[in-house]
Design a protein with these regions (language model features):
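Conserved ABC ATPase "signature" region
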Residues: 99, 103-126
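Conserved ABC ATPase signature
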Residues: 130-134
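Short, charged/small-residue-rich alpha-helical element at the C-terminal edge
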Residues: 226-297
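Catalytic Walker B motif of ABC-type/P-loop ATPase nucleotide-binding domains
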Residues: 155-159
Length: 297
């Protein structure tokens, strides 16, 4: 059984805008999965449909085998969602907010788990502070805690580290990775592509409501493997190297190469042409390169 099953998901709004156009994929139990795409790709619309906040025009979504429409209660008990927008109740402390959230799911005597969440998310010294007095980063931590309060097997994180400082980001991911090791399925959307690259087993990419890529992180990176070489030259780039040249915003020359053999050829050619290399910066292809290339297709 898949933790998440999405089949032919279509969402068309009343004005005729097609937010989702036949999206289908599965996420396995225990997987750390990334759902990526530019603004307007349909990611949040899909997450809203998963959470039962909006209905699909057609198609089916199941969470841990439970249909989100036909078996809504069981599906929602199986899913925890951290929304993109900051949503909080300004009248309660952090602990009170989590206790009320437990009550929404019919959970009693949940204080031990609430304490564990509070500690692991770095909220211990803010537990009795009113949420309206918290910083934006702290409020986002509370939202993560609320999504976890009913111990859902599937956790959706929609831009969880937006506006969060580096130290918290590291502690948050350590906590989430520990939950994943315990068997929780994690579905992440983020514009920090380095996070998706380092954390996720598989990656799906959406564009204009359509799924345009779905593969393991390793395979996606391997398919677009290569080197970016940034050169500051004293002289002109030889003509036989211009096929590798990419657009650059400054005085540097940017080359896109396949491997280190091509790099050796470039340096040898520059040497024979009498072109001095004043500075060189080398980076290997990362997920951002793959993402940009796929989105441009």
């Amino acid at each position: 059984m898949s933790a998440l099953h999405i089949q032919d998901a279509v969402k068309t709004y009343a004005n005729g805008f097609p937010a989702l156009r036949g999206v289908s994929f599965d996420v396995a139990e225990g997987e750390f999965f990334a759902l990526l795409g530019p603004n307007g790709a349909g990611k949040t619309t899909l997450i809203s449909a998963m959470a039962g906040l909006s209905r699909l025009t057609s198609g089916r979504i199941r969470v841990m085998g439970h249909d989100v429409e036909a078996d809504a209660y069981a599906a929602r008990m199986s899913l925890g969602v951290v929304p993109q927008e900051l949503v909080f109740d300004p009248f309660f402390s952090v602990r009170e907010a989590l206790q009320f959230q437990s009550g929404y799911f019919g959970l009693k005597n949940n204080d031990d788990w609430i304490d564990e969440i509070i500690t692991n998310l770095g909220l211990a010294d803010k537990a009795d502070t009113n949420t309206r007095n918290l910083s934006g980063g702290m409020k986002r931590r509370v939202m993560v805690a609320q999504a976890l309060v009913h111990r859902p097997p599937v956790i959706v994180l929609d831009e969880p580290t937006a506006g969060v400082d580096v130290e918290l980001r590291q502690s948050l991911w350590a906590f989430i990775q520990n939950l994943n090791r315990q068997g929780h399925t994690i579905i992440l959307t983020t514009h920090y592509l380095e996070e998706a690259q380092s954390l996720c087993d598989r990656i799906a990419m959406m564009k204009q409501g359509v799924l345009v890529a779905l593969d393991s992180t390793e395979h996606l990176l391997h398919a677009e493997k290569g080197l970016r070489v940034e050169l500051l030259l004293e002289g002109a780039l030889p003509d036989n190297l211009r096929a590798w040249q990419q657009p650059s915003n400054d005085d540097t020359v940017l080359l896109k190469l396949d491997d280190y053999e091509q790099l050796a050829f470039v340096l040898q050619t520059l040497k024979y042409a009498g072109v001095k290399v004043k500075h060189m910066q080398l980076t290997e292809t990362d997920l951002e390169d793959v993402f940009v290339k796929i989105m441009r297709k």
